[in-house]
Curated annotation (Swiss-Prot):
Its main location: plastid. It comes from the Eukaryota. Pfam families: Cytochrom_B559, Cytochrom_B559a. It is a single-pass membrane protein. GO terms for biological process: photosynthetic electron transport chain. This b-type cytochrome is tightly associated with the reaction center of photosystem II (PSII). PSII is a light-driven water:plastoquinone oxidoreductase that uses light energy to abstract electrons from H(2)O, generating O(2) and a proton gradient subsequently used for ATP formation. It consists of a core antenna complex that captures photons, and an electron transfer chain that converts photonic excitation into a charge separation. Keywords: Chloroplast, Electron transport, Heme, Iron, Membrane, Metal-binding, Photosynthesis, Photosystem II, Plastid, Thylakoid, Transmembrane, Transmembrane helix, Transport. It comes from Chaetosphaeridium globosum (Charophycean green alga). This is Cytochrome b559 subunit alpha. Heterodimer of an alpha subunit and a beta subunit. PSII is composed of 1 copy each of membrane proteins PsbA, PsbB, PsbC, PsbD, PsbE, PsbF, PsbH, PsbI, PsbJ, PsbK, PsbL, PsbM, PsbT, PsbX, PsbY, PsbZ, Psb30/Ycf12, at least 3 peripheral proteins of the oxygen-evolving complex and a large number of cofactors. It forms dimeric complexes. Heme binds at H23.
Length: 83
């Protein structure tokens, strides 16, 4: 026989007014915050990824591949110094 954990049943939680008062504000707020985070470009700055127009510069049109196993640090330094 299974025991009782003392938690409220899920059906009671999602049918309560308090749940929907809280979540009717938080769910849209999280969506809007995420949309602003991405659309303003802050996500690119926080995670350090290049913006779509920065993948290829006018000077460097080739794909920056690391091909050497033992001199990868030197290759990486050459690629990043041109950025």
């Amino acid at each position: 026989m299974s025991g009782n954990t003392g938690e409220r049943p899920f059906a009671d939680i999602i049918t309560s007014i308090r749940y929907w008062v809280i979540h009717s504000i938080t769910i849209p707020s999280l969506f809007i915050a995420g949309w602003l985070f991405v659309s303003t470009g802050l996500a690119y700055d926080v995670f350090g990824t290049p913006r779509p127009n920065e993948y290829f510069t006018a000077d460097r049109q080739e794909v920056p591949l690391i091909t050497g196993r033992f001199n990868s640090l030197e290759q990486l330094n050459e690629i990043t110094k041109s950025l």
